[in-house]
Amino acid sequence: MHNMSDIIEQYIKRLFEESNEDVVEIQRANIAQRFDCVPSQLNYVIKTRFTNEHGYEIESKRGGGGYIRITKIENKDATGYINHLLQLIGPSISQQQAYYIIDGLLDKMLINEREAKMIHAVIDRETLSMDMVSRDIIRANILKRLLPVINYY
């Protein structure tokens, strides 16, 4: 059985499929009521599964009649998406942010499950056993070298 976050994520992705659009607009209260969950559960899904690293932009308006607008970032080809990711990676990157990037590559079928697991192993904090600042810098450098390879090979 999937957890509530997985169910909400699949529902939002289905909205994209059914609409054939690059934008989906949802209301927190309606989704929370539909899935009998608190609005913060929806916020968690949006913040962790519909990030820039996953290829989405979020616009949110709170209050009565508020909405969450989720837009698929338009990158019609792998090169555009890879370039977008390269711009997101600064001089350092946390393990979680790096995992979001890998998940996005997997979602867009630019890598397979095996490759994703190998990349996870290489950039994991256990592998990069050093102080956090150095670890995050090295992780960013690894990804910056790896992404063009994924794009061109």
Curated annotation (Swiss-Prot):
Residues passing through the membrane, by range: none
Keywords: DNA-binding, Repressor, Stress response, Transcription, Transcription regulation
Signal peptide: none
Gene3D superfamilies: Transcriptional regulator CtsR, C-terminal domain (1.10.1200.150), Transcriptional regulator CtsR, winged HTH domain (3.30.56.130)
InterPro entries assigned: CtsR, CtsR_C, CtsR_C_sf, CtsR_N, CtsR_N_sf
Record-level GO BP terms: regulation of DNA-templated transcription
GO MF entries: DNA binding
Role played: Negative regulator of clpC, clpB and clpP transcription by binding directly and specifically to their promoter region.
Family: Belongs to the CtsR family.
Protein name according to UniProt: Transcriptional regulator CtsR
Record lineage: Bacteria, Bacillati, Bacillota, Bacilli, Bacillales
